[in-house]
Design a protein with these regions (language model features):
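Substrate-recognition "cap/lid" segment bordering the active-site pocket of phosphatases
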Residues: 117-155
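Short, acidic loop-to-helix structural element flanking the phosphoryl-transfer center
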Residues: 6-9, 69, 78-110, 121, ...
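Generic structural signal for small/hydrophobic residues in well-ordered secondary structure
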Residues: 13-16, 56, 101, 111, ...
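Short, conserved loop/helix-junction motifs that constitute active-site signature segments
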Residues: 4, 102-104, 128-132
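Alpha-helical elements of Rossmann-like donor-binding domains used by nucleotide-donor carbohydrate transfer enzymes
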Residues: 26-30, 48, 62, 66, ...
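A metal-dependent, Asp-based hydrolase signature
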Residues: 51-81
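Short, solvent-exposed loop/turn segments at secondary-structure junctions
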Residues: 17-18, 24-25, 115-118, 142-143
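Active-site neighborhood of HAD-like aspartate-dependent phosphohydrolases
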Residues: 2-45
Length: 155
């Protein structure tokens, strides 16, 4: 039997722990107000297709075609994407603490997260998540989402 002292890997989520959720309901509500969208309709369409986006089966543009740009709009796609990205913010204290702690902790730290590729890539680059994690197991790359047991078996 393995002793707890032998464990050398820690798994972290990103959304809601270190950063805001990538594209949570609060952000979608803000988008509805900012861009004059019907939130109830956006929410139904989002729930219909977002899992497919998170496992990397469609791109962000394809997600947006289904959920936002299924009608002519008086705003452009890039403005909407910029808004989506701007909703990713660092939560107080945790990320900086993890980056510092990781330097001498002796553990491998691995991120397991449900993120679409474009949002995942943006967040890794913008918040320099490579300084906090040794590896990423992202739903968009492994074609499975938490809580699918398969994603944890990969870890």
């Amino acid at each position: 039997m393995q002793k707890i002292n032998d464990l050398k890997i820690l798994f972290f989520d990103v959304g809601g722990i270190l950063l805001s959720n990538g594209w949570g309901h609060e952000s979608r509500k803000k988008a509805a107000v900012k861009f004059g969208l019907d939130y109830a309709e956006v929410d139904v369409l989002h729930n219909f297709i977002f899992n497919v986006y998170e496992i990397g089966s469609i791109t962000l543009d394809e997600y947006l075609d289904t959920v936002i740009f299924n009608y002519p709009r008086d705003f452009v796609r890039q403005d909407f994407k910029d808004f989506m990205y701007s909703e990713s913010v660092e939560l107080p204290d945790m990320l900086q603490w993890l980056k510092e702690w990781k330097k001498d902790c002796g553990f491998r730290i691995i991120s397991i997260n449900n993120e679409g590729k474009e949002l995942n890539d943006y967040r890794v680059q913008k918040f320099k998540l490579h300084k906090a994690f040794d590896a990423f197991i992202s739903s968009c790359e492994v074609k499975m989402r938490k809580p699918d047991p398969g994603i944890f078996k990969l870890a």
